[in-house]
Amino acid sequence: MPVELTGVRVVELGCGLGVPSLVAAARGAELVATDWAADAIDLLHQNAARNGLTLGAKVWDWRTPWEGTFDLALAADVLYEQRNVEPLVHALQQLAPEALIGLAGRPYEQQFLRSVEAVEIAERVVRVRTAGV
């Protein structure tokens, strides 16, 4: 990820506590964090406030349409259920020309990687994996 994200429109999918969102916002991104759980969005707003950051956040289920596009999509450790694979692939197709996806060794990652290959967006998806995870 570039160090400077000023003016870059970023969406995080399945933000949870929002660590990628917080980092991107701190680097100047115009950010919208999304999660299906309202509690996650509430915690993200608390974390942003504690860090002096401002960001957009919205409850969103990947299975529903989204209006608009972004420059970059982020997601970290979101492939813990098989039912998330195809909606994630579809969301990535629609939302942004580039994506950084943090992999955490979940069982459905290979299915996800095959799916992005099948719909010919694999070149738009950069996998990020921590050594030893």
Identify the function of each model-found stretch.
Residues M1-V133:
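S-adenosylmethionine-dependent methyltransferases
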